[in-house]
């Protein structure tokens, strides 16, 4: 889809609505987000199966509804020019801690240690991207603490990125030989 979008899911499918952020705020948010590859890989289907076991559905639904209720708050922080963008980082921290309670495989001791290290280095919040168990860890950090965070996470691959308005596209294609 490209750009910033809010995706609302319902029983009929989903609805994609653009979130309009000023270029200045978007640039600031991009600068304040720092992403790292954890080096841990996993199959998201395995994580989902493990997370579906255990806790009662009623309890999980309650937590997921709380997470969903925070979407409006996050959107408001991003859109309103007078809101403190650092609140987005704090909200990431809160929602990550909430997400961790939704399944035993969302996080691991190693990921928890990396997250703690990031917070101790000055990040206001962060989250693991995807189903959990590994992959990419993203942090929100104030500019004055950005290099501290990068230094603290020096054992991980720092992955610089920029927000994209155009959506998914192929940027490199290498033809392969297929026997058919």
Residue map of PLM features:
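C-terminal nucleotide
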Residues: 1-126, 138-180
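Glycine-rich active-site/cofactor-binding loop and its immediate structural neighborhood
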Residues: 134
């Amino acid at each position: 889809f490209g750009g910033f979008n809010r995706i609302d899911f319902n029983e009929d499918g989903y609805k994609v609505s653009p979130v309009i952020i000023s270029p200045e705020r978007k640039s600031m948010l991009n600068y304040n987000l720092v992403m790292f590859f954890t080096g841990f890989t996993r199959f998201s289907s395995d994580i989902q199966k493990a997370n579906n076991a255990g806790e009662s559905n009623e309890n999980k639904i309650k937590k997921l509804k709380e997470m969903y209720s925070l979407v409006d708050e996050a959107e408001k922080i991003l859109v309103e020019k007078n809101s403190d963008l650092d609140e987005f980082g704090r909200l990431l921290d809160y929602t990550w801690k909430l997400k961790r309670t939704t399944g035993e495989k969302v996080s691991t001791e190693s990921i928890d240690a990396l997250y703690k290290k990031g917070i101790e280095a000055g990040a206001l919040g962060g989250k693991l991207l995807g189903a959990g168990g590994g992959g990419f860890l993203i942090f929100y950090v104030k500019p004055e603490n950005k290099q501290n965070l990068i230094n603290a996470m020096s054992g991980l691959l720092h992955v610089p990125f920029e927000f994209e308005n155009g959506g998914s596209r192929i940027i490199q294609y290498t033809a392969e030989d297929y026997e058919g």
